[in-house]
Amino acid sequence: MLNLDFIYENRNMSESEAELCMINIIDAPDTVKAAFLTALYVKGITPDELSGFSRALRKLSSISINIDKLTDIVGTGGDHKNTINVSTAASILLSLRIKIAKHGNFGITGSHGSADFMKFIGYKFEMTEYDIIKNLNEKNYVYILAPVYNKTFAKFSNVRKKLGIKTVFNILGPLTNPLNPENLVIGAYDDETAETYASVMLKQNKRAFIVSSTMDEISPEAESHVYYVNNAIRKFDLDPLSITGKRINESNIIEKDPVKSFNIIIDAFKNKNRDAASFIALNAAPALVLNGISRDITSAYDLCINDIESGAAYERLRRISNED
């Protein structure tokens, strides 16, 4: 039964209350959904509530398989930078060494979302659970297109458009991968959101790097704020110069035209665009630390760059795009 007493009592929900509330509100009238989203917007969202909502949405997914040692790397979007889709590129690069379950969608806030790039390279989104397991076993990689495996977001789309405000759904995406990976690298559009994500990761017993900078990923030229979650939360600042040995001008990795942006990524994998390659490797590196492949981000970055320079990364891109 749907209970929205928290609205009238002006209080925060517990994690279990939030989970039950989300499950029950899915099929409520749009007027009720609007009241729910507006109340959260005015009140503010706590880590308990965000954790409960994300658990509910994962339960509502059409995927019911459990696979250990998966990693996702994802950004919130919303920085309006039109950078190349570095999290998607990094996920493909990382599949050379770890199992990746990339969760994403077509572009909403930017002109080119992760699914737009995957479609560009020829990836087939519709998969059975057997296909998902097969791809992970054979290629270390699967891309989970959010609307295909979870219809919940679509049920709120009309209300969100009419409200015209940032709702909890703007930040739920990175937390709702139906394969429930235990390791996550999340780029957040501001430090407050990054801190909230870190608290949620701790509550859900996950290992994570949460980053925020001038963009929703590790910046190649400015310091990034990092929350490292592994049984506790540790915050530190990351200077890209100390990792890459050079600063990359952000203008070299920003492109509004989707096709040109996608080709920057492909050139990076071919080792023809060193600035973009460095940017991708920088953002891939934390995932290798989470998985125990590297002891620190610098050595992880070196591994990622070597995988690009050796040609292995481009071969993996071709294999994932079903060209093999």
From Swiss-Prot:
Coiled coil: none annotated. Pathway: Amino-acid biosynthesis; L-tryptophan biosynthesis; L-tryptophan from chorismate: step 2/5. 5-phospho-alpha-D-ribose 1-diphosphate binds at residues 75, 78-79, 83, 85-88, 102-110, 114. Its EC number is 2.4.2.18. One of its GO terms (molecular function) is magnesium ion binding. Catalyzes the transfer of the phosphoribosyl group of 5-phosphorylribose-1-pyrophosphate (PRPP) to anthranilate to yield N-(5'-phosphoribosyl)-anthranilate (PRA). Anthranilate 2 binds at R160. Mg(2+) 1 binds at S87, E217. The lineage of its organism: Archaea, Methanobacteriati, Thermoplasmatota, Thermoplasmata, Thermoplasmatales. Mg(2+) 2 binds at D216, E217. Keywords: Amino-acid biosynthesis, Aromatic amino acid biosynthesis, Glycosyltransferase, Magnesium, Metal-binding, Transferase, Tryptophan biosynthesis. SUPFAM superfamilies: Nucleoside phosphorylase/phosphoribosyltransferase catalytic domain, Nucleoside phosphorylase/phosphoribosyltransferase N-terminal domain. Homodimer. Belongs to the anthranilate phosphoribosyltransferase family. Disulfide bonds: none annotated. NCBIfam families: trpD (TIGR01245). GO terms for biological process: L-tryptophan biosynthetic process. This is Anthranilate phosphoribosyltransferase. GO terms for cellular component: cytosol. Anthranilate 1 binds at G75, N105. It is an enzyme of class 2 (transferase). Pfam families: Glycos_trans_3N (PF02885), Glycos_transf_3 (PF00591). It catalyses: N-(5-phospho-beta-D-ribosyl)anthranilate + diphosphate = 5-phospho-alpha-D-ribose 1-diphosphate + anthranilate. HAMAP family: TrpD. Binds 2 magnesium ions per monomer. The gene is trpD.
